[in-house]
Design a protein with these regions (language model features):
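Low-complexity, charge- and small-residue-enriched intrinsically disordered regions
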Residues: 61-76, 139-160
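Short, small-residue-biased leader/transition segments that mark boundaries at the very start
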Residues: 2-9
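Oxidoreductase cofactor-interface core, primarily capturing Rossmann-like NAD(P)-dependent enzymes
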Residues: 11-120
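Mid/C-terminal beta-alpha module of Rossmann-like enzyme folds, strongest
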Residues: 85-149, 159-202
Length: 202
């Protein structure tokens, strides 16, 4: 069983998605029974993306959005993904499943939802991807992290985190954000630190 992002394309111009496609192909070539789960954005305890959007909203006077911000995401709760993995682990069918949550957001609407829930609604401005990358690079230096890569920006803006299929998760991100509004974004969560220190919690 393997977990990969929603879009794994062998001919993608983005190395990340080509790598995921190679992984899927290698797994299929083994001949063993397998389930390939393709989650989009994850949320849950010690979340990175949702938490760090909230962190930025708590501290910055405005929030920059790459381009129009109309590209879509289907966040899935980490416990829903885990339950799906356990369920498929007990089966012997070869399947590929798009693991998505019950809600679809544009990126702009996601930021707006988080801001409203934590009481930090901020003006959103559209910025060119190149400027957004430089701004994220500078902020990343301040917090000792790589906040986003150029390929991640391209994948996000290409709508690669959206797929037209029924949701597999049942937990709504809007409900989860409301339940955790008091603590969300109080501290920055470093993905780089977690990769370096494997003892850090996820």
């Amino acid at each position: 069983m393997t977990g990969v992002q929603t879009c794994a394309l062998p001919i993608s111009p983005l190395e990340y998605f080509r790598g995921k496609a190679r992984l899927e192909r290698s797994l299929a070539d083994t001949g063993i029974s397998h389930a390939i789960l393709r989650p989009t954005v994850l949320f849950g305890k010690e979340d990175i993306l949702i938490n760090n959007i909230a962190w930025a909203l708590r501290r910055l006077p405005v929030f920059g959005v790459f381009g129009t911000g109309k590209y879509r995401l289907q966040p899935i709760y980490v416990d829903d993904l885990a339950a799906l993995a356990v369920e498929q682990g007990g089966k012997h069918d070869n399947v590929t499943i798009n693991a998505t949550g019950p809600e679809t957001f544009t990126y702009r609407d996601l930021v707006k939802c988080i801001g409203q829930s934590i009481g930090k609604k901020k003006p959103m401005i559209s910025i060119p991807p190149s400027i957004g990358y430089l701004a994220a690079w500078f902020l990343g230096k301040c917090v000792g992290d790589v906040m986003i890569t150029r390929d991640e920006i391209k994948g996000l803006m290409s709508d690669l985190l959206y797929v037209d299929s029924p949701p597999t998760g049942t937990t709504r991100l809007t409900d989860w954000i409301t339940e955790h509004a008091d603590t969300l974004g109080r501290t920055y969560t470093s993905e780089l630190a977690r990769r370096i220190d494997r003892n850090k919690g996820y």
